[in-house]
Amino acid sequence: MAPTSATDALATADLPIRRCLELAYEALQAGGLACGSVLLDASGGVVAEGRNHAYDPPTGSQPLEGTPLAHAELNALARVATDRDLAGDTLWSSQEPCSMCTAAAAFVGVGAIAYLAPDPWALATSQSRAQEDAFAGAAGTPSVSGPVGEPWRTIANALFILSIAATRGPDHSTVARSRDLDPAALETALALLAGPRPWPPTLGGLLEPVWDVLLKAARG
């Protein structure tokens, strides 16, 4: 029987999916861009985690905090010891990693990359896929899989779009172009944007009021 609530669905979700989304929500709560990443070993154990800190005010708690390098994937990889062999590890991310993060994963020897949803920012800014395609098939490049199925894909991008709408306004180009590129995620994000503040303490609490709307939108 399918879960009837957001909280139940998250509790039964695969670990990397749940943690990527929870970390993305932590970034949203901090006023940043909702992206999360988790590195798993070959047995499915968590090696390291990270969230986007690029738009956080510098506090000294993260070396890259408040810089354009502070993507979720880089923050996760920065927690890994230099002498670790990452060939059997998988780097999960809430959105498809950008070329910088893909290159970093390849440089440190990550074996595989998996992501929940396509990157709305890259799509909305018409970023060329040529730089990502340049990595395809190159020696030492991690294998890549994604996006995942519903409702996780829609939730990942709804959080991403929501974080932009909440901090930069609903007319931001990423939000505006999502009307054509990802209407299900946009519908969910706008429903969440209209909800009460402050944000609920848990991701399940955030999604619960719009759970039925989200599932309907994800089904198309």
For every predicted segment, state its role:
Residues 35-41:
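Short beta-strand scaffold segments in enzyme catalytic cores
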Residues 45-55:
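Short beta->alpha transition motifs characteristic of CBS
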Residues 53-72:
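A short, polar/charged loop-to-alpha-helix boundary motif
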Residues 85-95:
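Immediate flanking context of iron-sulfur cluster ligation sites
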